[in-house]
Regions:
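Short, conserved phosphate-binding/catalytic loop or strand-edge motifs used
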Residues: 88-92, 100, 139-144, 148-166
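N-terminal structured subdomain of primase-like DNA metabolism proteins
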Residues: 1-102, 351, 358, 415
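Conserved active-site segments centered on acidic
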Residues: 81-133
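A charged alpha-helical hairpin associated with nucleic-acid processing machineries
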Residues: 4, 209-210, 253-261, 291-305, ...
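Conserved phosphate/pyrophosphate-binding and hydrolysis machinery centered on Walker-type P-loop NTPases
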Residues: 10-13, 103-113, 132-136, 157-164, ...
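Structured, non-catalytic alpha/beta "coupling" segments that mediate domain-domain communication
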Residues: 73-92, 202-221, 345-350, 354-358, ...
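Phosphate-handling DNA/RNA-contact segment within nucleic-acid enzymes
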Residues: 2, 14, 29, 52, ...
């Protein structure tokens, strides 16, 4: 149990606006601060922080309370975990009663998983920097990619030795329980019940939670064997749900808020290289298709997303439909393409920070206008295909909740599509009426007692 004098010191040092501001974009309004709810999907801010009272109130979800309550609700911390997080942030030493220290095994399930993934991150990082195998294979790979010592340390990059039980054996020896090694995905169970290392011979990319704790890993093989998967990622667990996580967000959130823009890239190396170049407002969806939950995470800090694509035209076209949900969440989307043979990682390494920024500034294009352009080129002179393109573009515009913004896009698209603006507006209104009718029917069906 944390002692009362320690709790008092933590609460005295804590600035509720500063802490909540790490998770929610707050704006001053009179004596209070307001922002969009992190607990509910809303477009009009109803989340309020009162620095004078030291409390928050979220009118969307009904939640409210102290900064400790906020952390417990948002990050699912226990009361002691929330206090320890604040203590770490403000450099306060935590004093606990002897009984609490002696009963570490009573820590809850979630915390036990966090502890074992944190231990693994330290093991892999030390294996990278302090073993001959790690230095000659893992570290040389990271250095070849141009990553500095500061980047390697900041992102806690690591290496998993190419042995069956290097990590598992050490973890068991140090008292970590088999159930948590297996559940976290760090170790895999054989038919005979023994465990072996999941990430043998891979460079390791720890994935951090919103508050900076390691919750999962991505492991990349350096072997050329095509039968070996290039990446192995942590399975879903109580602490890791990949649809709710963006790689690099913990390190990017401050810059995203300051720049009022988030660069979205594809892979770990893209994040690391761009961040290292001083452009820190960058995250990756970690190999998964972008989810609504990830979009809402970004939306806490900015309404502007710039998606950075490499030159793979097929991949770009496949992702276009998925981006409509960004519009549906009320965010603004721009697209930047890199030349064939380049991705954000290679481009920033070859042309530097200034060249990278210039390329983005010169080539960024609004998503809907870009989508119109790419689909029109594909349709050519075929009138049937062109009609399909028109419907698809209007469907995208219909997702935009802001009617004024939608009208502006209709005007732009009518010029690009060479079709009367009134025809597009008519189609837009039909789609919106159909959606409103469908939503109304769904609401009624949910209210009818079974």
């Amino acid at each position: 149990m944390i002692t009362k004098p320690t709790i008092d010191r933590i609460m005295e040092a804590t600035d509720i606006v500063e802490v909540i501001g790490e998770f929610v974009q707050l704006k001053k309004r009179g004596a209070n601060y307001v922002g969009l709810s992190p607990f509910a999907n809303e477009r009009t801010p109803s989340f309020t922080v009162s620095p004078a009272k030291g409390i928050f109130k979220d009118f969307s979800s009904g939640k409210g309370g102290s900064v400790v309550t906020f952390l417990m609700e948002l990050e699912k911390f226990s009361y002691p975990e929330a206090l320890k997080w604040l203590a770490k942030k403000y450099g306060i030493e935590v004093e606990e009663t002897v009984e609490a220290v002696e009963n570490r095994e009573e820590e809850n399930h979630r915390e036990s998983l966090m502890i074992v993934t944190g231990y693994a991150a330290k093991f892999f990082h030390e294996a990278l920097l302090e073993t001959e195998e790690g230095k000659s294979i893992g570290l040389s790979y990271f250095k070849e990619r141009g990553f500095t010592n500061d980047t390697i340390t900041k992102f806690e990059l690591g290496y998993s030795p190419d042995q069956w039980e290097a990590f598992t054996g050490r973890a068991l020896q140090d008292g970590y329980l088999q159930e948590f090694l297996e559940e976290s995905g760090l170790s895999v169970k054989r038919d005979n019940g023994s465990l072996y290392d999941r990430y043998r011979g891979r460079v390791m990319f720890p994935i951090h939670s919103f508050t900076g704790r390691v919750i999962a890993f991505g492991g990349r093989t350096l072997k050329s064997d095509k039968n070996v998967p290039k990446y192995v990622n942590s399975p879903e667990s109580e602490i890791y749900h990949k649809s709710n996580v963006l790689y690099g967000l913990y390190f990017a959130k401050k810059a995203i808020r300051e720049e009022d823009n988030c660069f979205l890239v594809e892979g770990y190396a893209d994040v690391l290289s761009v961040h290292q170049a001083g452009i820190e407002n960058v995250v990756a969806s970690s190999g998964t298709s972008l989810t609504v939950e990830q979009i809402r995470l970004i939306g806490r800090f900015t309404k502007n997303i710039t998606i950075l694509y490499d030159g793979d035209a097929a991949g770009i076209k496949a992702s276009l439909r998925g981006l409509d949900m960004i519009l549906e969440e009320g965010l603004n989307v721009k697209v930047v393409l890199f030349p064939d043979g380049h991705d954000p990682d290679s481009y920033v390494r070859n042309f530097g920070t200034a060249g990278f920024k210039k390329h983005i500034e010169d080539n960024k294009k609004d998503f809907i206008l870009y989508k119109t352009d790419i689909l029109l080129k594909e349709a050519g002179n075929d009138p049937i295909k062109k009609a399909d393109v028109i419907r698809e573009i209007v469907e995208s515009v219909a997702k935009i909740p802001d009617s004024i913004k939608a009208s502006v896009f209709i005007k732009e698209c009518s010029y690009l599509l060479q079709i009367d603006e009134r025809a597009l507006l008519s189609e837009l209104n039909k789609m919106r009426l159909a959606k409103a009718k469908k939503d109304s029917q769904q609401m009624i069906s949910r209210q009818v007692p079974v």
